[in-house]
Amino acid sequence: MPVLHLPSGEVIDQSLAIMQWALAQSDPQGWLRASPADEAMHWIALNDDIFKPLLDRYKYATRHTEQPQCAHRAAAITAFIAPLNERLLQTPYLFGPSPSVADIALFPFVHQFAWVDKAWFDAAPLAGVQAWLAVWLGSDLFGAVMVKSPARPP
């Protein structure tokens, strides 16, 4: 869970609020302008409120044994991945030709979903999501923030 401590003493402890604060300071790629705010927040809320709990059940299926892992995956696809895929089959990013705050907020969760069973994800009929995720994973931005830190001693 990221936490931002501002020089004023204010603490921002929600990922979306941190993103919004940072983009209000500087938005050189226009992520806030690239999407209608209501629609962007709809996708982010769908991710946070619906997809994330389903992702956790899929990712940590040994903790959620009331259904098999494939049932958790199917629920996540129906509720979130399939609608996202339909959208991304029409346009390279959620709201057109340019990335938006919603794209940057969602892709880490879709990345987690893909890596639970990478072979299955790569073979699934999800061309829109797969292409979109590949762009993010191949981006300089992703490479810059995913630098491996040395392990801390116990």
Where are these regions (language model features)?
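Structural signal for well-ordered, non-membrane alpha-helices
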Residues: 48, 52, 81-85, 137
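Amphipathic alpha-helical packing segments from all-alpha helical-bundle domains
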Residues: 71-88
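Catalytic and substrate-binding regions of cell-wall glycan-acting enzymes that process beta-1,4-linked
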Residues: 119-127
